[in-house]
């Protein structure tokens, strides 16, 4: 499986310290960068869906608006802008909604 290309970095990634998985695809990441930075670097802008099925993406980039919610390692509703990447991390976009069967 080949790595997703980071075509949208502001500066080229000088050193990839790890690999994480975005929607099942591996991508290089650097220590200290956020999940949102990696998502932006590979061009993933649609991160979630609202109650009306409309796509949404990151808005504030600092954890206030909660528009960048993704599932990380199976845990829903994690803020991509506030989460630092870890080796082997698994990120799923547009999967932050609870299914009816999962509701308490």
Curated annotation (Swiss-Prot):
UniProt cross-references to InterPro entries, sorted A to Z: 2Fe-2S-bd_N (IPR042204), 2Fe-2S_ferredoxin-like_sf (IPR036010), 2Fe-2S_ferredoxin-type (IPR001041)
Record note on pH: Optimum pH is 8.3 (in the presence of Tris-HCl). Active from 7.3-7.8 in the presence of other buffers.
Catalytic reaction equation(s): glycine + 2 A = hydrogen cyanide + 2 AH2 + CO2
UniProt binding sites for [2Fe-2S] cluster: 60, 65, 68, 81
Keywords, sorted A to Z: 2Fe-2S, Cell membrane, Iron, Iron-sulfur, Membrane, Metal-binding, Oxidoreductase
Cysteines joined through disulfide linkages: none
Induction: Reduced oxygen levels.
Residue ranges of the TM segments: none
Pfam families in alphabetical order: Fer2_4
Enzyme nomenclature, EC number: 1.4.99.5
UniProt subcellular location: Cell membrane
Regulation: Oxygen is necessary for cyanogenesis. Activated by succinate, glycine methyl ester, glucose and D,L-methionine in addition to glycine. Phenazine methosulfate, methylene blue, 2,6-dichlorophenolindophenol (DCIP) and ferricyanide can replace oxygen for the reaction. Inhibited by pyrrolnitrin and acriflavine at 1 mM concentration.
Gene Ontology cellular-component annotations: plasma membrane
CDD domains (alphabetical): fer2
Temperature dependence: Not stable at 0 degrees Celsius. Decrease in activity up to 40% immediately after freeze-drying procedure, with a further decrease up to 10% when stored at -10 degrees Celsius.
Keyword Cell membrane: yes
First-tier enzyme category under EC: oxidoreductase
Origin superkingdom: Bacteria
PROSITE patterns found in the cross-reference section: 2FE2S_FER_2
Every 2Fe-2S ferredoxin-type domain range: 16-97
Any one Gene Ontology molecular-function term assigned to this protein's record: glycine dehydrogenase (cyanide-forming) activity
SUBUNIT field: Heterotrimer of HcnA, HcnB and HcnC.
Job of this protein: A three-component membrane-bound flavoenzyme that catalyzes the formation of hydrogen cyanide, a secondary metabolite, by transfer of electrons to a cyanide-resistant branch of the aerobic respiratory chain.
Record-given protein name: Hydrogen cyanide synthase subunit HcnA
Taxonomy of the source species: Bacteria, Pseudomonadati, Pseudomonadota, Gammaproteobacteria, Pseudomonadales
Gene responsible for this protein: hcnA
